[in-house]
Amino acid sequence: MLSFWEKSSLLDFDYIVIGGGLVGCFAALTYKEAHPTAKVALLERGLLPKGASTKNAGFACFGSLSELQDDLNDCSLDELVSLTERRYKGILHLRASLGDEAIGYAPVKGFELCLDEVNLEQMAFFNNALRSVFGSEPFSDHSSRLNSYPFDSQIKGLIAHAFEGTVHTGKLIDTLYKKLGEIGVRVFTGTELLSYTESESKVQLEVTSGHQGLNLNAQKVAFCTNAFTPLFFPELDIQPGRGLVLVTKPIEGLHLEGSFHYHSGYNYFRAIDQRILLGGARHLDKPTETTHEFGTNPLLRAQLVKDLNELILPRYSVKVDYEWSGIMAFGKNKQPIIKKVSDRIAVAARLGGMGVALGSLLGKEVADLL
């Protein structure tokens, strides 16, 4: 049973955000900064964010050359340029909001490993298309420097992206949660939304935490639940995409700087703390990986380990230390969903595997909608 004090002071809010990942944190942060006296709460069903915000590889990336080429199968060049611009603006907003040191940002560039020689004509095409986004040409041919990398001779080309980098995902989320606490946002972890009911005067949220269920009331609600959004809005074009990440044991003598992609962006790796963090290969078994369930696909894991030993570090003795998975959200195209569902409810979702780049911007946009 609830007390008088709980009923009178702890259940009613001006603005509630569902989902405690990067988008949700920035939605709460943006709204509270714009309305300092508002009562703002953030609900996260896990003790830690459950989606991809703490499960990603920490890449501040905007699309490798072959990935952009693939994207043109599903959208126009103008749409692709616009989306790339949003990704870039998202990283700039993230860095400006929290500071590079607080999020562990490193401007180490991005690199695409090519099994064939670099397509210079393709590179020139995208440099010309994206020059207005970045202020200069983002891509350059670094194939002549391949000998300075530990990769196998199967790699015939190396394309650099001058504006990409990496972040420390743990520091990023930790910084956000601290900032939310400092400005007075109530954060409820381990709290799951079961259902909601909208009326003319409010939105009532039925939630559960542990064995306790109760109703919270809000004037406005932002759903920032990415791949899990169809639980509440099944009509939206959102499919889950599970991503597998492995991290090796420390590797003596490892010197590797940058964020790396291959196979049209599906595979990726980076060095951190003398380890290699690598993931992806979802394209090898998309039907199985179209799931909300966390777990490891043996086929994908075997291929990643093979790539690690034969393609990335063939001259090193490397052992996998541990692994995890995260759930991303995709659709018929890579355009994110930012939508006002009613006067009181808005949705920000479907980040297309680019949550680090898009998350802060989408959080701001969904807060501005309400």
Enumerate the predicted regions with their spans.
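Extreme N-terminal leader/targeting segments of oxidoreductases
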Residues: 1-15, 33-34, 38
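Glycine-rich FAD pyrophosphate-binding loop
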Residues: 32-55
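Flavin (FAD/FMN) cofactor-binding and adjacent substrate-gating region
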Residues: 66-72, 96-178, 183
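Central helical "cap/lid" subdomain
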Residues: 207-257
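Flavin-binding catalytic cores
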Residues: 252-253, 290-325
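C-terminal catalytic lobe of FAD-dependent flavoproteins
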Residues: 314-370
